Amino acid sequence: MKKKHRIKKNDEFQTVFQKGKSTANRQFVVYQLDKEEQPNFRIGLSVSKKIGNAVVRNRIKRMIRQSITELKDEIDSGKDFVIIARKPCAEMTYEELKKSLIHVFKRSGMKRIKK
């Protein structure tokens, strides 16, 4: 993911948590915040230490980033997203993780996601 598509700073995460709306399924919680002045979407990832050691957490983050890269044309621009991974993600394959991510994005009201 390019730098323009990332949320890195703590205050940006907090803004999305406090002002954004959340949608969840068993594997993910997605917070989204509209930012019309922004030309593209931005994603922040959070994987708790409860999920596993650093190897497991980084694997989950890599799979989420790859899914986002494949879905980038279908994700609404002008929004900030914070994706929080839950415990079941640790045992999922890439295909299952991507399918679950698409499901939670659809639940959040994104109409352009078709896969």
Swiss-Prot record:
Reactions it catalyzes: Endonucleolytic cleavage of RNA, removing 5'-extranucleotides from tRNA precursor
SUPFAM superfamilies for the chain: Ribosomal protein S5 domain 2-like
Keywords: Endonuclease, Hydrolase, Nuclease, RNA-binding, tRNA processing
EC number: 3.1.26.5
Gene Ontology terms, MF aspect: 3'-tRNA processing endoribonuclease activity; ribonuclease P activity; tRNA binding
Disulphide bridges, residue numbers: none
Pfam families named in the record: Ribonuclease_P
Any GO BP annotation: tRNA 5'-leader removal
Domain of life: Bacteria
InterPro entries per UniProt: Ribosomal_Su5_D2-typ_SF (IPR020568), Ribsml_uS5_D2-typ_fold_subgr (IPR014721), RNase_P (IPR000100), RNase_P_CS (IPR020539)
GO cellular component, one term: ribonuclease P complex
Stated role: RNaseP catalyzes the removal of the 5'-leader sequence from pre-tRNA to produce the mature 5'-terminus. It can also cleave other RNA substrates such as 4.5S RNA. The protein component plays an auxiliary but essential role in vivo by binding to the 5'-leader sequence and broadening the substrate specificity of the ribozyme.
Oligomer status and interactors: Consists of a catalytic RNA component (M1 or rnpB) and a protein subunit.
Family: Belongs to the RnpA family.
Protein name: Ribonuclease P protein component
Gene: rnpA
